[in-house]
């Protein structure tokens, strides 16, 4: 029977590649998006169908514990219990700390970090009971090294690492692995829209002299979602072209 995978933030640039890769690998894939993206999600679903992928979309504000619980309950009832969770939802509210307001801080922490707890908590018990689970948290190179103007984002992404390592210890003997991936710069609509000088400056600082393709991030996730990674837990995979080495 196909394993069921939920990808939060699943209709974004990286999320799309994750969804299609997991579907190619034989998973039944469910994408999540914010309720405000419902219209875009319908177009996204049709575009994936045209590519040969039948991917369901469930809306929920994953920064809300109650809405996350509702979503997972509906997925379980309509599709089945979730075997693979990819926590990919994320936003930025970049400001220098001098200009950062509480709203900027809370928005990023709520979506980028609290959502990881909110959704994982809904699937955790079932994974333990069934003796199998894969939880993959999408962090960032900036959660390892920090980034000017991203105190909120860097803190949230760094928090994922502690969460991952702690939870991995609780699931290890039960067949549930918990890992993190830390991408560097990825070629998405957002990075392609950058000023050429800014983009070229970023690329010059990457040892591989290019940004990652979304499919390269998805390939790493596919490995962590599969059986061959069953002995890996509590780990962080840096997929950053050598931008940060630790």
UniProtKB/Swiss-Prot annotation:
One Pfam family per UniProt: adh_short
What EC number(s) has UniProt assigned to this enzyme? 1.1.1.36
Q: Which reaction does it catalyse?
A: a (3R)-3-hydroxyacyl-CoA + NADP(+) = a 3-oxoacyl-CoA + NADPH + H(+)
Q: Does the keyword NADP apply?
A: yes
Q: Which residues bind NADP(+)?
A: 12-14, 88-92, 183-186
- UniProt: substrate binding residues: 94, 147-150, 184-185
What GO cellular component term, any one, is given? cytoplasm
Q: Which InterPro entries match?
A: Acetoacetyl-CoA_reductase, NAD(P)-bd_dom_sf, Sc_DH/Rdtase_CS, SDR, SDR_fam
Q: CDD domains attached here?
A: BKR_SDR_c
One GO MF term attached to the UniProt entry: acetoacetyl-CoA reductase activity
Q: What class of enzyme is it?
A: oxidoreductase
Superkingdom assignment = Bacteria
Q: What is its main location?
A: cytoplasm
What are the subcellular locations of this protein?
A: Cytoplasm
UniProtKB keywords: Cytoplasm, NADP, Oxidoreductase, PHB biosynthesis
**Biological process annotations from GO:** lipid metabolic process; monocarboxylic acid metabolic process; poly-hydroxybutyrate biosynthetic process
In which pathway is this protein known to take part? Biopolymer metabolism; poly-(R)-3-hydroxybutanoate biosynthesis
Q: Where is the active site?
A: 153
- Look up keyword Cytoplasm and say if it applies: yes
Name the protein family: Belongs to the short-chain dehydrogenases/reductases (SDR) family.
- Its protein name is Acetoacetyl-CoA reductase
Write down the species: Allochromatium vinosum (strain ATCC 17899 / DSM 180 / NBRC 103801 / NCIMB 10441 / D)
Which gene is transcribed and translated to give this protein?
phaB
